[in-house]
Each structure stands twice: as C-alpha cells, then as structure tokens.
Amino acid sequence: MEKLRIIFMGTPEFAVGILDTIIKNNYDVVGVITAADKPAGRGQKIKYSAVKEYALANNLTLLQPTNLKDESFLAELKALNANLQIVVAFRMLPKVVWEMPNLGTFNLHASLLPNYRGAAPINWAIINGETKTGVTTFFIDDKIDTGAMILNSEIAIEPAENAGQLHDRLMNLGSTTVIDTLKVIENGNVITTIQEDNNDIKTAYKLNKENCKIDWTKSGDEINNLIRGLSPYPAAWCFLKDKNEELSIKIYEAKLLEEAHSYEAGKLISGKKEIKIAIKNGFIQLLSLQLPGKKRMQVAELLNGITFSDEAKVY
C-alpha cells in the first residue's frame, strides 16, 4: 500500500465539502491549488475563493497560479512531491500538470458521466427534467470530462428540489465517493471504465443570460424545471411589463397549477396574496422573486407594497 501525498485543486463551496472530508479522513494533503483572488461586487473588493478560505483556516500549503503553465508554479508544484492530485470544480489542466503525479490526477464531476459533461451539470439535470443524477470520479485526460471512470454513485432528484438543495446532497455524496476512490487507489485495486460516446449524450452547457431566460410559451413542466434548476443561483429571469413600465425580474420559486383558462401565455393575474402567470396548460404560481435593486422576497410580501393592472404581462 502506497501512502498518498495529495494535492487538491478546487475553487467553490462544493469543493470545500470534499476537501474537508479528505482532511477529516486523515489523508495527507500536501498542497491546495485554487483560483487567483479577484475583485467582486459593487465595491470591487478582493474576494477569496471558498477553498482559499478553508485552506488558510486549516494551515494548508496554498498556491494560486494565474497561469498553470508558468515555470515557477510548475517548480513549486513539483517540489510538493505529491503522488496523486484531486480536482473538484476547478479548471481545465494542461497535460504537464495532470500527468505530474505517478498515481495520476482524478476529478470528481457532479453527474453520471458521460452525460452532463461541462460547466453546470447540477443545473442542467434539473432543467432537463431528469429523475436521477449522481457523481463520477475519473482520471483526467486532455479533453473535458472524458477520462476513464473510476467510481460513480447515483441519487434520485426529488420532484420539488432546486439546484441549491441538490448541490448540497451531491456534495455529501461526492465526499463519500472521493474517499472510496482514494481507498481503491491506495490499495492498488483501481478498475476503470472507458466512457462511451453516443449521439444521446446530454451536455451541461455554461449558463448565460440567454439560456436562463424563461420562455412562457413552453410547457409548465419545462418552465418549472428551469426555475428549479437555476435556483438560487443564477436564477431564472424574464421581463415584466405593466402599462408603460418594464423591468426584469428573477424568479426563485414557483408552483405549477394545471387549470384550464383562456388567457394568453404570459398574462399576469394577481390577487391580494398571489401572482399567477398564464401558460398553455395552466398557470405558474410565483412564490419567491426579486425586483431590480430589491432583495429576494415572497410574493405576499411584494403584494403588500405593489399592485398590478389588468395589462400586466411577462415575456
């Protein structure tokens, strides 16, 4: 059994949960690589990544390269003398980095590969109405999320679950799967499976303003899945127009109501405590939303200070 000397690479909160589990299982993490500090928010203050915050709090050796091919970074990386690297929600690695340790570099990806390769697997699984998803560990190669698979674990997606809730459950599942992967590697019992490509593979495209916008002519399930799949971040959005005022709103939570009606898709109907949007097979009842420059609020709270006319619509 070879004693593992691990370098961990990751940036967001999802990666922190995995790193914490590795540390708590008494593995030797000789270095942590995370994104360089960036200014964020209105004040453009320097913001540390979640992984950096964790590494500093736990006195772990930390490197923050801007260029992964930089000679000085590569020298520092080599000097850590790791025999295994683990990547969780980081960035694409050059070959000179991923082939450095003799036991290889493996990645934890939040989908059942080969489906949902790419930047936003948790979101797209919900957006596309999947009923199950999971996590996969695989050895990195020179493409994105295509390497030989080591282990995977599957869970059901709950009918009303949003991306944030699924994120947390997959982080827990991923932690267990990474530890199981470490055990087979250190015992020399790794059996990998090649990913098979076919035309039915679904992709986890990068999220942008365009693919986060609600199309109110789609079915109720499609709209509701988009809202769930983008909540709480970055959030599904649309335009709201009432008389001469137009603004963009973010919708965090909604409910599908299958009721017959004769309204045009996008018509907004509001009562004293509820807002419903007409769609082709019923209504989408809005539960939680955000107006520009305001905080997120429940619909009942919004209706305490605002009323809508009969002309109100979304698009």
Curated annotation (Swiss-Prot):
GO molecular function, one term: methionyl-tRNA formyltransferase activity
Family matches, as InterPro entries: Fmt, Formyl_trans_C, Formyl_transf_N, Formyl_transf_N_sf, Formyl_transferase-like_C_sf, Met-tRNA-FMT_C, Met-tRNA-FMT_N
EC top class named in words: transferase
One Pfam family per UniProt: Formyl_trans_N
SUPFAM superfamilies listed in its UniProt record: FMT C-terminal domain-like, Formyltransferase
UniProt-annotated binding residues for (6S)-5,6,7,8-tetrahydrofolate: S111, L112, L113, P114
Database matches in Gene3D superfamilies: 3.40.50.12230
Stated name of the protein: Methionyl-tRNA formyltransferase
Recorded superkingdom: Bacteria
Homology family: Belongs to the Fmt family.
Species for this entry: Flavobacterium johnsoniae (strain ATCC 17061 / DSM 2064 / JCM 8514 / BCRC 14874 / CCUG 350202 / NBRC 14942 / NCIMB 11054 / UW101) (Cytophaga johnsonae)
Record-listed E.C. numbers: 2.1.2.9
Physiological role: Attaches a formyl group to the free amino group of methionyl-tRNA(fMet). The formyl group appears to play a dual role in the initiator identity of N-formylmethionyl-tRNA by promoting its recognition by IF2 and preventing the misappropriation of this tRNA by the elongation apparatus.
Keywords from the named record: Protein biosynthesis, Transferase
Catalyzed reactions: L-methionyl-tRNA(fMet) + (6R)-10-formyltetrahydrofolate = N-formyl-L-methionyl-tRNA(fMet) + (6S)-5,6,7,8-tetrahydrofolate + H(+)
GO cellular component term of the entry, any: cytosol
